[in-house]
């Protein structure tokens, strides 16, 4: 049975690979990104594909993307929280705005999308949420303070989200 996959950050890198793999396996895909032209160019056209604008830092965008997904395909079976960014540098040289953007995109963003998807999955009484993290969430690295902080947060959030 085909599933409906909602994938964030589907305009490049791993997001493109995940979306293509799901499409090739016969699933329906809602591919999201801030730049829908980039997402559409990366994935091409398919009756099984819906491209939706989504800035994961905006809860209203997440709600709209979920609504568009359900309107088109009737359900969401798999959420892949893939979108992220990366600010590198010595901690004291990173601007406060860069730290905020890093945490907003890589930590709060997946929370926004998951919060919007959960009511759909609870109503269906099924669903799978995959949140892409990094080894930076387990062990920090030079010049990666902002990124590691966001990924340590993701690791903690996903560990304690499971029972609820």
Enumerate the language-model features and the residues they cover.
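Conserved glycine-rich cofactor-binding loop
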Residues: 11-13
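Active-site loop immediately N-terminal to the catalytic Tyr-X3-Lys motif
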Residues: 92, 139-146
């Amino acid at each position: 049975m085909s599933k409906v996959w909602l994938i964030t950050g589907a305009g490049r890198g791993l997001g493109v690979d995940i979306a293509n793999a799901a499409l090739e396996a016969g699933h329906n895909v809602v591919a999201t990104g801030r730049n829908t032209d980039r997402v559409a160019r990366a994935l091409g056209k398919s009756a099984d594909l819906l491209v939706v604008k989504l800035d994961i830092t905006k809860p209203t965008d997440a709600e709209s993307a979920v609504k568009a997904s359900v309107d088109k395909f009737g359900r969401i079976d798999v959420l892949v929280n893939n979108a992220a960014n990366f600010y590198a540098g010595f901690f004291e040289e990173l601007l406060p705005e860069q730290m905020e953007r890093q945490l907003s995109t890589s930590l709060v963003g997946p929370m926004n999308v998951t919060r919007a998807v959960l009511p759909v999955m609870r109503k269906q009484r099924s669903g799978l949420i995959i949140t892409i993290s990094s080894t930076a969430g387990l062990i920090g690295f030079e010049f990666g303070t902002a990124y590691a902080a966001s990924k340590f947060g993701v690791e903690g959030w996903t560990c304690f989200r499971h029972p609820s």
